[in-house]
């Protein structure tokens, strides 16, 4: 029952005190099972039906869906349960102890983004869920900070089709309706080693990579010329060469060279389209040197995302906040939730605090966030 729910600050404190770090390095990676159990128990106390979904391909990670109300449509409030690892030497406070000081709540996940669930639970104290005309769903996902496996799997497997969704990432309560995607690849070239005194007896992978880079830079120019979205600060897809390694000695013909690169596509560009453009760009090298060039994903790709600017969700939220929706360059789970329904990214705290030592959320966000959650529930679930 509602009177069993702890006070807002104690909910917040318990969430921060429950570690749920996501990391590609197995030694740092943690299950989110304890955090999911916390959330599930609280939502059950509020009368929600709760489903816990194991996420395949992860190290004991789970999604949670809490639901109440009947019928079609309704509202989905979503967020991720995991945090990034922390640099112990750069934190001046215990990352897992919620600390309030000078108008700020400090702790790992205060802004990005465990705190959003505390706001939802607190707002629901004043909502009679038995009187909702449409369903209300709360989604807590796993592994957003690494593979986004939780949101991907939920979107692939659910039959839910809400009217709209809000993902509570830290946007300083400024609504976001679009962002770029992210694709990161490793270009690997396998040459043939040999003594540098006889170049004809080897195939220098660095020289082949030099040729490949020239074609990749031509692709970068093509992306800049062909695709535009003026609302973005950088209004075209970017392509970055971020890391390269090859060879082991100055007197040996380089046998292997590897380049890491990324592309940040605009909304509307498909992953198949981008893969085709990259493969076409590298085709001259592949054709000249069959079997020596490969392209592999470094991370699962994230498509760009856009909520239609004239959708009711945009109009309602802009009116409630008195602020226009924005577009941003960072990535969220929105592309996957958007496959289910129109989606906005909107939550308390600043994105500038995400992944930072001494992460905090300013207490000035508490009242307006609680009010906003109550208002959107009333608008989309009561009418």
Swiss-Prot record:
UniProt enzyme class: hydrolase
Record EC number: 3.5.1.16
GO CC, alphabetical: cytoplasm
Cofactor note: Binds 2 Zn(2+) or Co(2+) ions per subunit.
List of catalytic residues: 82, 144
Subcellular localization(s) per the UniProt record: Cytoplasm
Requisite cofactors: Zn(2+); Co(2+); glutathione
GO BP terms in the entry: L-arginine biosynthetic process
Main localization category: cytoplasm
Pathway: Amino-acid biosynthesis; L-arginine biosynthesis; L-ornithine from N(2)-acetyl-L-ornithine (linear): step 1/1
One GO MF term: zinc ion binding
One of the Pfam families matching this protein, by short name: Peptidase_M20
Family statement: Belongs to the peptidase M20A family. ArgE subfamily.
Record's protein name: Acetylornithine deacetylase
Organism from which the protein derives: Escherichia coli (strain SMS-3-5 / SECEC)
């Amino acid at each position: 029952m509602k009177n069993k729910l702890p006070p807002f600050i104690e909910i917040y404190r318990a969430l921060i005190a429950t570690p749920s770090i996501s990391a590609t390095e197995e030694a740092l990676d943690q299950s989110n099972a304890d955090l999911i159990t916390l959330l599930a128990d609280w939502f059950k106390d509020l009368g929600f039906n709760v489903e816990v979904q194991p996420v395949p391909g992860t190290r004991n990670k789970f999604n949670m869906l809490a639901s109440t109300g009947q019928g079609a449509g309704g509202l989905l409030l979503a967020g991720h349960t995991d945090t990034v690892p922390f640099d112990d030497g750069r934190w001046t406070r215990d990352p897992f102890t919620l600390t309030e000081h000078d108008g700020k709540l400090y702790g790992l996940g205060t802004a990005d983004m465990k705190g959003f669930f505390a706001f939802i639970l607190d707002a629901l104290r004043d909502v009679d869920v038995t009187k909702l005309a449409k369903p209300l769903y709360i989604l807590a996902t796993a592994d957003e900070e690494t593979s986004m496996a939780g949101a991907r799997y939920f979107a692939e497997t659910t039959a839910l089709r809400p009217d709209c969704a809000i993902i509570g990432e830290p946007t300083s309560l400024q609504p976001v309706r679009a962002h770029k995607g992210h694709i990161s690849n490793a270009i690997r070239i396998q040459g043939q080693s040999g003594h540098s005194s006889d170049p004809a007896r080897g195939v220098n992978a660095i020289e082949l990579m030099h040729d490949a880079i020239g074609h990749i830079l031509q692709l970068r120019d093509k992306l800049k010329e062909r695709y535009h979205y003026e609302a973005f600060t950088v209004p075209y897809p970017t392509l970055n060469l971020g890391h390269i390694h090859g060879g082991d000695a100055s007197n040996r013909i380089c046998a292997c060279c590897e380049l890491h690169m990324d592309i940040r596509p605009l909304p509307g560009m498909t992953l198949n389209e981008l893969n085709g453009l990259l493969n076409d760009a590298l085709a001259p090298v592949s054709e000249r040197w069959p079997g020596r060039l490969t392209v592999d994903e470094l991370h699962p790709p994230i498509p760009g995302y856009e909520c239609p600017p004239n959708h009711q969700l945009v109009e309602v939220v802009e009116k409630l906040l008195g602020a226009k929706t924005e577009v941003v360059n960072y990535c969220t789970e929105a592309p996957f939730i958007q496959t289910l329904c129109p989606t906005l990214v909107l939550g308390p705290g600043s994105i500038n605090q995400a992944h930072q030592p001494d992460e905090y959320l300013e207490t000035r966000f508490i009242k307006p966030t609680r009010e906003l959650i109550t208002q959107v529930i009333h608008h989309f679930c009561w009418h």
